[in-house]
Amino acid sequence: MRQKAVAVLVLAVALGVMAPLVGRTPRAAAARLVSIDEQSPTRSALFIESAAMDRVIQVQVLHPAGGGARPSYYLLDGLDPGQQQSTWTNATDAESFFAGKDVNVVLPLGGQASYYTDWQDDDPRFGRYRWETFLTRELPPIIDATFAGNGVNAIGGLSMGGIAAYVLAARNPDLYRAVAGYSACPDLGMAQGAIMFSIANRGGDPGNMWGPPGSPAWAEHDPARMVDRLRGKTLYLSTGTGIPGPHEAEIKPQLPENIFFGGPIEAGVDACTTAFEQRLRAANIPARIDRNPVGTHSWSYWGDMLHASWPTLGPALGSQ
């Protein structure tokens, strides 16, 4: 019990330093594709007017240059998503990795500290967050129509985005065939303090998301309480231990941050992953969980995890 409490406290403190709602009827899912910037034959930026959020959202898509119908992998960012470019393409080799693969990789921009969910109330710092409505109702028809999507989807993400991937999959089980979390904590009972701290650390009011701790909305978004809704899906989780590894041997400006903050965060995530795995096992739900003996909460490892996850996710989508 003490180990669990310490892990929660460490995760809550460190995470904030590092970089549809039940009982409410969401606005009608209507979005408009404003424009497309074809940045290359295999990379496009879509500018989509979201009715739910009353703003234009940029979504970058990695896609084959041609061909027929294909699945889509919605890949979410961390606590501080890129504004002009997805951090997945800026900090990892995701673009070259997916080149030649028969899949659309959908990378939404923006949404700092949003947890990609529908907030109960508009926030003075962030404005109107209705990310679940956007990602699950407004965006998929546009992606499928524009990039020959065949309706087969997976969703994944790192840290905040990985938590959100499991939340969205549990709340929208018919939409996704596979789910991936890279250094994510899908057990909100353990992650609650970290989530609230991280939102406040970025200037938001955590109560505007799902209300105060103990509110019904927290339970209604907790994948650990909805594991049966993940049954039949391909599930993937990956985590390190917080112990510095090969990427800490690289001399780079963020090295101290990766070790002194990224290490404790990843240790907390590892403990949370164990708790979530126990929930899955108790329900007899299989999952592929890669536990790396070393690794901090940092982008070099998330790039590695993305590679390691594809032999699990690709076949589930019908894409190699």
Where are these regions (language model features)?
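Non-catalytic cap/lid and distal C-terminal segments of serine-dependent acyl enzymes
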Residues: 5-11, 18-320
